[in-house]
Each structure stands twice: as structure tokens, then as C-alpha cells.
């Protein structure tokens, strides 16, 4: 799961878009180990928002943005967060294994 998320973030970065933070949503996001490892692998702060209807909210906000041309404000209340500097070796080992071709792409 986190490998695919890291690949997605890398693809976004390859397009010149800065990834400043990642929101983890879903059952696995509640696991503190997943939060910590995600921050290391993605090398950005990871936030777990309070429970909510984020998929529906996101779709509605995108529709409003497309129709109005104005980006809607979206405040997310935080349930938990993890910074990427907790265990730097995790991210380093992940990137080294990926560079060697040891991880699927």
C-alpha cells in the first residue's frame, strides 16, 4: 500500500508539483506504525484527519471549484500526524531498495 502511495507521490513530483503533506484516510491510516512509515517513505508530513466523508466532500469541492473558478477553502481537523524525521532509516532503506530494483514499481 505505501509503496504504491510513494510511487504516486513520485509521479506527482515528476510533474513539477510540490508534495507538502499527505492525508491518510481509511482503516490502515489509524495505525500509528503506518503513519510513521508513510511519513518516512513519502518524506513529507502525514496527517490523519478526524472521521468524515472526505471522498464526497472532495468531489463536491472539486465540482464547486470547476463551476465557480474559485478554489474552496477546506479546513481539515486532525486526528493524528507524523513527521518524516522520526526514523529516517526507513525512508532511506525504501529508496535504496527501490533503486536496486528490489521493489515492484
Q: Which residues fall in each region the model found?
A:
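Glycine/Thr-rich phosphate-binding loops that ligate phosphate moieties of nucleotide
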Residues: 1-105
Amino acid at each position: 500500500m505505501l509503496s504504491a502511495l510513494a510511487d504516486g507521490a513520485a509521479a506527482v513530483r515528476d510533474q513539477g508539483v510540490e508534495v507538502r503533506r499527505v492525508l491518510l484516510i481509511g482503516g490502515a491510516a489509524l495505525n500509528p506504525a503506518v503513519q510513521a512509515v508513510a511519513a518516512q517513505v513519502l518524506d513529507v508530513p502525514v496527517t490523519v484527519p478526524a472521521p468524515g466523508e472526505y471522498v464526497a466532500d472532495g468531489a463536491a469541492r472539486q465540482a464547486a471549484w470547476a463551476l465557480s473558478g474559485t478554489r474552496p477553502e477546506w479546513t481539515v481537523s486532525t486526528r493524528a500526524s507524523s513527521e518524516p524525521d522520526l526514523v529516517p532509516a526507513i525512508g532511506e532503506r525504501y529508496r535504496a531498495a527501490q533503486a536496486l530494483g528490489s521493489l515492484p514499481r
